[in-house]
Amino acid sequence: MEGNLWLYRLYFRVVILLWLPVSLSAVDLPNLTFRTITISDGLSNNIINTIYKDKRGFTWLGTQTGLDRFDGINVKSFLQFSGRTIFSIAETDSVYLWVGTDKGLWKLDRKTDQVELVTLDTKSLEVRSVFVSQTGRLLVGTTHGLFIYQESAFRKVLFGSNALSSINFITGIVEGYKDTFWLTSQGGLIEYNIETGQSKVYTYQDDEKFVSYFSCLALLKEKLYLGTAGSGMLVFDIGKAAFSICPEVENGYIKSIITVNDEIWVGTNGSGIRII
């Protein structure tokens, strides 16, 4: 699964797990080594929005005010991103790193450390999610729609004609099956077929609440685990096209969700991390 799903927004410090050759089961957790990294170690900010481990083994940290790289010993801050909020990180090859920020999409050449601002609609378009498919296709989720990189250019996809509508505020992307991608947005869960262009929007409603704002998502065994902005975590069964409430996380603002082996790790806004 793509590295940019490692989304933990931690306040005042970030804990980096220096992985040993063991699985992340409960019996193995005592064998993990933990190290705390803060601004005193060179981190650009103690608020971490995204963590991405690249194919060369470097850990990239997207913070509230910059981009950092951790090599296991030292932290290197990239001054080119100073003052920018980093939301998402991905790589398409061994050279280029794609960085989604509050001021647009940037491409970092890791050989030269040169950066390039990639124009989508406008240079200042906020990029919340950057995702690379299994075939190497780049998808970029922004506050004004989805952009797909193909044939050396970006193609814009809108869900509804109004780019400013909540459904086009994309917060997360995962890859499903048979050309299908699942996107979370402030206006619902989107099922999108990248080949046909067809899409369908799902929202949750019961006798007590209506939920359309989804903050993040993860896919595990034909089920989507969806973070919300105040209603905890919902589960969407793809085969049944039906929602259910996750009783372990019924309330709260979910900041991040990832899969670790067959477990779901949920990053909350102020209540730490829950493992399901």
What role is predicted for each listed range?
Residues 1-276:
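Carboxylate-rich, polar loop motifs that coordinate divalent cations or form catalytic acidic clusters
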